[in-house]
Amino acid sequence: MPSPRVRAARPQSRRRRVKVALTKGTLLVPPTYFALAHAGAMPEREWRVFTLAARVSDPSVTLPIHEAAPGALSPALPLRVAAQARGLGAMRRAVSSWGPDVIHQHQATWSLPAVGAARETGAPLVVTLHGGDAYPRLGRGLGAAWNARNRRAAFEGATRLLAVSRYLADVALRAGADAARLSVHYQGVDTQWWTPSPGLSPGTRPNLVPQGNHDLAAEGADSPEVPIVLFVGTLSRLKGVDDLVCASSSLVERRPHRLVLVGDGPLAPSLRTSAPAHVTLTGPLARERVREWMRRARILALPTKPTQGRQEAAGLVLLEAQACGVPVVAYRTGGTPEMTAPGASLLTGERTPDALGCAIDEALAWSEEERADRAAACRAWVDAERSLRGSVDQLRAVYDELTGSPLRGCRAASDE
């Protein structure tokens, strides 16, 4: 495997900040805050985002964003494909002309512009692998061939490869990644933002809906006698939504609860027409609204399962919920065990609606004392082991290493 070229570190003046180019095929915020979270926590560096197209509706996002092909998000497939093809070279040239000290690509898919810019400028290239982009064979046809081409380019051109879980690092190794350049880098969540309700201990659910949130009240969030089982994510079979609705429906008569599904996806239309009365579909929500639901939930259920050759690599929503003091019920699959507090949440090895229903039943039967203890353990574990703070420290060390600092970065995959 050819070694990527790395530009020799150049002396940094006191006034000049290290420039980091964040690159990604497309950028949608919400929900993909992960691509920007580390930048917001490292203001000592100069950041610029380069993408084919972006759709950012959150006003708190202030990083400069360069779009090479805005039409790449067109709903019309021919227009979208044409814009993507035109935008690849434009994106590469834009990154190169900015003269970054480090290029950080999120997802190996659509990595060709970043790989090309790193080759042109000599800047070190960091590639974070997030899931399906690391698999050696996934899907068929032209799309699969395109993904494979990008994956090979990223594996060969990256100075450092970062996998979001140990599970995904193993997938990448089987796909041909160089163990010497591959590290596990957990993305982490902001435990100062994802918190239990102010003034309440983890595990204590508020009884009142904040003023102005009439939709929450109308959907039953202010009924403390009816516990909420919460799901947040894409409404798809990969996320196990079909199993969750089945398990919840078989349980609700003997263990009353409300199942709240936050998000959108391919299963949404059928769920809207056929979901039982105790199931609420909210659609996509802003982060603040997601946090409100988490603070009211008894548990978060995220039964992701193997689908079409892939498994969930990490699942930041698991960390967000636990940081809010909400234990998790999930299948033991992919990187999920790495995202749950040991002994505080429930993971079932049997991936069936019956097993899931039993786990949800057990969680809803916890006493107030046990629930509070588990909630506190969940939050403490996320804060100590999976916080954004710790993740930023690791990534800062990687950047410093690549630009000449003696600080060490993440552990190599071969050492774990």
Language model: regions and residue ranges:
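Nucleotide-sugar donor phosphate/pyrophosphate-binding loop at the beta->alpha transition
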Residues: 84-87, 124-126, 134-154
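Acidic donor-binding loop of glycosyltransferase active sites
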Residues: 295-310, 326
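Conserved acidic donor-binding segment of nucleotide-sugar-dependent glycosyltransferases
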Residues: 342-354, 362-368
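N-terminal subdomain of nucleotide-sugar transferases
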Residues: 1-64, 249
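Nucleotide-activated donor-binding/catalytic signature segment of Leloir-type glycosyltransferases, i.e.
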Residues: 269-291
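Carbohydrate-associated surface elements
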Residues: 167, 188
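Conserved donor-binding/catalytic core segment of Leloir-type glycosyltransferases
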Residues: 21, 162, 202-211, 217-218, ...
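Short His-centered aromatic/hydrophobic patch
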Residues: 105-110, 129
